[in-house]
Regions:
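Conserved core of the sugar-phosphate nucleotidyltransferase
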Residues: 1-99, 117
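Left-handed beta-helix
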Residues: 58-181
Length: 181
């Protein structure tokens, strides 16, 4: 768990339980609380931010999915069973994979499990989970040759060619060699 330094409604929170060697049992996991709840978490001193860093054995994760999201587990297993190996890359089968209901591991497993622990850390951490956080992490700067006209919330990252963006909002343009996103 990351040391919580402010009440943030965009992060998950971990409540420390009983001490374990090197960490704590996870007493509770709450994903993205409202502001009043986040303020209470910060005040009680027992909560850390979820840094999104998880370590599972394959079977443990599948057991948790089978327990808390059985349909998701079934589709994951089907996608793997029907998937294909291409050199060092494994591609799950598209049809069962596409049927999996969108849900994060935070909601699907971590809020429900009784078999989790946490290790508290204090480090330079930032959740680059939205455009504002990315902009803040980059000091708001676009990089590479660019020109923005009549734009809001636009970021450019180019390693070569000049990028011009006109009259657009809420986009990021990335140029990496011959690839453009």
């Amino acid at each position: 768990g990351i040391e919580a330094v402010s009440p943030h409604t965009g992060y998950g929170y971990l409540r420390r339980g009983a001490a374990l060697p090197g960490g704590y049992a996870l007493d509770a996991f709450v994903e993205k609380p409202d502001l009043e709840t986040a303020q209470g978490f910060l005040a009680d001193g027992r909560h850390s931010w979820n840094g999104g860093i998880f370590a599972f054995g394959r079977e443990r994760l599948l057991d948790e999915l089978r327990t808390h999201r059985p349909e998701m587990a079934r589709l994951c297993e089907a996608a793997v069973a029907q998937g294909a190996q291409d050199g060092a890359v494994f591609c799950p089968a598209q049809a069962p994979f596409a049927e999996i209901e969108g849900d994060s591991i935070d909601y699907a497993v971590m809020e429900n499990t009784t078999r989790a622990a946490m290790v508290p850390v204090s480090m330079g951490w930032s959740d680059i989970g939205n455009w504002d956080a990315l902009r803040e992490a980059r000091d708001g700067a676009s990089t590479g040759p660019h020109e923005l006209r009549d734009c809001t919330n636009v970021m450019v990252d180019s390693d070569g060619p000049r990028v011009c963006v006109v009259g657009m909002d809420d986009v990021i343009v990335v140029v990496d060699g011959d690839d453009i996103l």
